[in-house]
Amino acid sequence: IDNPDMPSNCKAAVAGSLEVMAFITAAGGVRAVDLRSTPAIYTPSTTGTGPGEMLSLEWDAAGARFVGRADDGGKTVWFLTPSGAPYSGGSAWAWSSTTPSGGATPPNEAGTGTHGRLRVVTMAGERGLLYLPGPSSVPHFFRAGVA
């Protein structure tokens, strides 16, 4: 895929079950790639309010949605749920978010992006979002219901 208008410090994610890759553009919009045959970039329509800034995404298979964090620090976790017809010309994808009330607030991410330091995980029966803002940062875990 040539020059997809993706900032260098963001992370795309693949929804394997849907055969779709999604990423956030430099302007904060959503772009997707239909991976079912010859890859084709398209702009899905969205509902709700997105973060409006750079975002690293991860696919949450159990929740059937993309999960992400903006690079602004803070606790807000963003969700981008593809529609039942997520491909070009299909139904709108839905933005939503949550901001946990407790716990420590992660710092801003490293200026070069998260580079894979954002993961949806299940461990010892606990499901959530594991986030490491920088290579020498303390890890943060957002529990299930958040991720």
Please annotate each region the language model reported.
Residues 3-14, 49-59, 105-120:
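Repeated scaffold domains used in trafficking and secretory/extracellular systems
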Residues 49-88:
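Loop/turn-rich, solvent-exposed surfaces of beta-rich toroidal or solenoidal domains
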Residues 1-4, 45-49, 90-109:
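Surface-exposed loop and turn segments in beta-propeller and other repeat-based domains
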Residues 1-42, 51-53, 73:
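Beta-propeller domains
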Residues 33-40, 79-93, 143-147:
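Short loop/turn segments immediately following beta-strands, especially the blade-tip
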Residues 28-29, 71-76, 125, 135-138:
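Short glycine/acidic-enriched loop and turn motifs that connect beta-strands
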Residues 17-22, 62-68, 123-132:
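Entry beta-strands of beta-propeller and related beta-repeat scaffolds
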Residues 109-147:
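Blade-level signature of beta-propeller repeat domains, shared across WD40, Kelch, NHL, RCC1
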